Amino acid sequence: MKLCTSQQFGVAVLFIVLNICSPLADASPIAWDFAVTLRDKILFVDNRWRTIGSAAHEFEELSALAFDEAEELIYFNDQQHQNGSIFSLRRDATVASHIVEQAVQRTGNDSVSGLAYDPLNRNLFWADMRQSKIYFASIDTLYTEPPKVLVDLSAEGGRPDGVAVDICRRQLYWTNCKINHATVERIGLNGTGRETIIKQDIDMPRGIVIDQLSDRIFWIDDKVGIFFALESARLDGSDRQLVLKDKHQSPIQLAITEDTIYWTDKADKAVWSYPKPAYNKPATNSSETQPQPTKLASWKDDVYGIVARTGFYQHLQKDAHCASVVRKVKQRLDNKLNNRTHERSAVEERMDALEREHCLNGASYMSRGNFCICPVGYKGARCEISECHNFCVHGTCEISDMGYPKCYCQEDFYGERCEYYKCNGHCLNDGHCLVDKESGELSCDCRENFTGTRCEHNETAHCASYCQHLKQHPDAFVPASCVDICEELHLSNGTIVTEYQAAAPLCADGPSSLRSGSVIIVLVVGIVSSLALVAVIVHGLRLIYKPKRPRIKKTFVVRKQARLNSASDTPLTNRPLATEQCEITIENCCNMNICETPCFDPKLVEQQFAARDRKSPCVKEDKKILIHNMEDDLLT
């Protein structure tokens, strides 16, 4: 009986190892770094923006996102769901599936634009743009309970959009995108102390996020026209700075990590990133160009919400404002684990031991979410990676109070990771670079015949002109630094002098030829310009004083009633004559080209031209003949 029990226990332990250690290593929820909402699903991606999973396929119109990093819960909104408005999603690593539960019941025609979560009081906050209100509700209560109103903007016509919770200082920030009265405001989580912190030079603010590492807020403003702006300020609205201004995008929501800002773009259906300004880091002496936004991923469907894993509980354990909040949240999680009152078998105890061994370096294991909370200075699914591992290239690494690696560089190197050599490219022409140990200043030990702070001057090439001039005029002045070089050139029997004569000619020859060439170019350009100006003036005068073509007017008589055919009328060609008559003036009939639109009888004109040519030809008689014949033809 004991042998059978031992075998069963061994099999159970093996089963536990395979089903706990492997899933935690391979299918842990820590595997994803970002989550974004498309129209009908939530995508989970890693830090290289490769899709590693998706969820919530049963929904049709997803929008806002919020993330509870303490319990690995995603909160999202569905605009089209009939019963629920906000839902929670938990990724189950053991069975590679997802559990979705309703968190807030739909109260009417809801339109959630922004969503935020407070892990201390376990409250959800969201902005309803259609009802112009900001609501909140506890996830510990039943989802059927109606939410409460924190801020009511309906009386002033406000349009709340993005919301963000400062969990350390217990404040709620939101953007109001009301046209011509847009603002960024904040209020205490208890509903007191509302104030407007940004109200100037702002058009349509959308997403907003709190950065606890720099104690600043970041928001995105969809400007009028084709531009948008990414701006930042301190938590009280002071020290406002423009981070980025770009165009041809429709930004919606924001997320932020240690060193990067992310936002969703509805126009390109994509996610973009931009480096976060280093507010709390010392500036390096390396010249860097202005970075450009980077498109990380794009999809066929519209993209709306985005959340990022920040490592909040690892990096803010020693922060002055956040330490107490982090401690209370961890204490609440530990109390949940200690409240298990059911009896535990030997297999369950062994399972707990394996779970504790799974998280390394003193990390805490969270059985509800199957993940590890790492201590300061470690990361990874099992907290197995030191933050200082291979971080500093030429220096010593230490973990700062914020939980980030910091490098102390060797005296010849600089940079955030000590990756830049101070002397790299400083000394020219094979000069040797020296670094002062006390001041850190750079100096160069130059080769022979090279001078300058960076060995940039070639004394041989510089003195060649003087030496050439000295050869022709022995009494000429030569700088003291060129005396030895000229003696060497003289001893070489003119070989080096001839070589440097082509490379560095005397100052009297080079500039004169250059000046003569410049004078010729200026003269040619001036003559051509003058001729062109004269041609333009002559052409203008011709257009002004050119005689106008004569305008010809003729008057014809038209009778109202036709008479009977007379003997002089020919069949099919007689024209009626009128007893009552009126005058019709035809103007400028024959001013057209006679070759294209003749208004004469060609045979008759030909006879007239033949008779005229036998006499003296006259151009002015042509129009008279044309009009005369046309008048006779019409009257007959």
UniProtKB/Swiss-Prot annotation:
It is a single-pass type I membrane protein. This is Protein cueball. One of its GO terms (biological process) is triglyceride homeostasis. Has a role in spermatogenesis and oogenesis. One of its GO terms (molecular function) is Wnt receptor activity. Residues 350-384, 419-456 form the EGF-like domain. Glycans are attached at N83, N109, N190, N285, N339, N449, N458, N493. It comes from the Eukaryota. One of its GO terms (cellular component) is plasma membrane. Residues 28-517 are extracellular. Belongs to the cueball family. The chain crosses the membrane at residues 518-538. LDL-receptor class B repeats lie at residues 122-169, 170-214, 215-260. Disulfide bonds join C359-C372, C374-C383, C423-C433, C427-C444, C446-C455. Keywords: Cell membrane, Differentiation, Disulfide bond, EGF-like domain, Glycoprotein, Membrane, Oogenesis, Repeat, Signal, Spermatogenesis, Transmembrane, Transmembrane helix. SMART domains: EGF (SM00181), LY (SM00135). PANTHER family: PROTEIN CUEBALL, VITELLOGENIN RECEPTOR-LIKE PROTEIN-RELATED-RELATED. Residues 1-27 form the signal peptide. It is found in: Cell membrane. The lineage of its organism: Eukaryota, Metazoa, Ecdysozoa, Arthropoda, Hexapoda. InterPro entries: 6-blade_b-propeller_TolB-like, Cueball_EGF_LRP_Nidogen, EGF-like_dom, LDLR_classB_rpt, LE_dom. Residues 539-636 are cytoplasmic. Gene3D superfamilies: Laminin (2.10.25.10), TolB, C-terminal domain (2.120.10.30).
